[in-house]
């Protein structure tokens, strides 16, 4: 069985995000980029399923500019067998919406015919948490979201997911779509030999037009601003002063 894993290039989680001077989006020039942490977990889970004998091939895919190839090479260095790059140069004012990404992944899934599609439950840049669900809807496949445990056999996937007050266990007929939670696994580090091998591997390149997918966006970003700075705290001299401020200023008493 083949597993298709979707990955995304984002600003590294350790970088302090800054807004562009023209307020059209987030500054990405000369900023460290990396694979979305939830996507790393998706790749790791696909590799573990292959190593357990539940899958025979792991194919990584991404949508983005030429620089996104670095993210695919990270997936290859981790152990993915092949990679597909859907080339798309982003327009800050017309972002690539989750529905457009889901349409592209649907087209790739129809080409690759995987038994399972795994992707992170969300990306840390936009936090949309929509692509996996939309992909399952477009493919008319069952879905298991926020997976914290995955067990795979030839015909079914068993997914454990954390819900309010406990753990929910669901059974999915394959093919299916699964989105990963942070608790699912701990991604491995790519070894230096595998990193070097990944640099020489050929990445298949296609465009949305090649896949016959319309990715035009109906949404326009009007303005992006940084959150307001938090006001400095005030040291109070007594409990009486605290109570007075809670009553007369905050009006919570």
From Swiss-Prot:
Primary localization class, coarse: mitochondrion
Cofactor: record remark: Binds 1 FAD per dimer.
GO cellular component, one term: mitochondrial matrix
Compartments, as annotated in UniProt: Mitochondrion matrix
Domain of life: Eukaryota
Gene3D superfamilies according to UniProt: HUPs
Molecular function in Gene Ontology: electron transfer activity
Obligatory cofactor(s): FAD; AMP
Keywords, alphabetical: Electron transport, FAD, Flavoprotein, Mitochondrion, Transit peptide, Transport
An individual GO BP term: amino acid catabolic process
Complex formation: Heterodimer of an alpha and a beta subunit.
Family: Belongs to the ETF beta-subunit/FixA family.
Function: The electron transfer flavoprotein serves as a specific electron acceptor for several dehydrogenases, including five acyl-CoA dehydrogenases, glutaryl-CoA and sarcosine dehydrogenase. It transfers the electrons to the main mitochondrial respiratory chain via ETF-ubiquinone oxidoreductase (ETF dehydrogenase).
Protein name (database record): Electron transfer flavoprotein subunit beta, mitochondrial
């Amino acid at each position: 069985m083949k597993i298709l894993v979707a990955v995304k290039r984002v600003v590294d989680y350790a970088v302090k995000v800054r807004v562009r001077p023209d307020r059209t989006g987030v500054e990405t020039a000369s900023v460290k980029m990396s694979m979305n942490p939830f996507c790393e977990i998706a790749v790791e889970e696909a590799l573990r399923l292959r190593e357990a004998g539940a899958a025979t091939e792991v194919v990584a895919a991404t949508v983005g500019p030429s620089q996104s190839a670095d993210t695919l090479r990270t997936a290859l260095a981790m152990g993915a067998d092949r990679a597909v790059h859907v080339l798309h140069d982003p327009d800050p004012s017309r972002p690539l919406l989750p529905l457009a990404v889901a349409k592209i992944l649907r087209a790739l899934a129809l080409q690759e015919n995987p038994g399972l599609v795994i992707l992170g439950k969300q990306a840390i840049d936009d936090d949309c948490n929509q692509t996996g669900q939309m992909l399952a809807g477009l493919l008319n496949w069952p879905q298991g979201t926020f997976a914290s445990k995955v067990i795979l056999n030839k015909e079914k996937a068993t997914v454990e997911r954390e819900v309010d007050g406990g753990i929910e266990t669901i059974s999915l007929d394959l093919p299916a779509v699964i989105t990963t939670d942070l608790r699912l696994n701990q991604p491995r580090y790519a070894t230096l030999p595998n990193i070097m091998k990944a640099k020489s591997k050929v990445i298949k390149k296609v465009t949305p037009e090649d896949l016959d997918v319309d990715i035009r966006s109906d949404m326009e970003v009007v303005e992006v601003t940084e959150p307001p700075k938090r006001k400095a705290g005030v040291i109070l001299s007594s409990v009486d002063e605290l109570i007075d401020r809670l009553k007369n200023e905050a009006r919570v008493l």
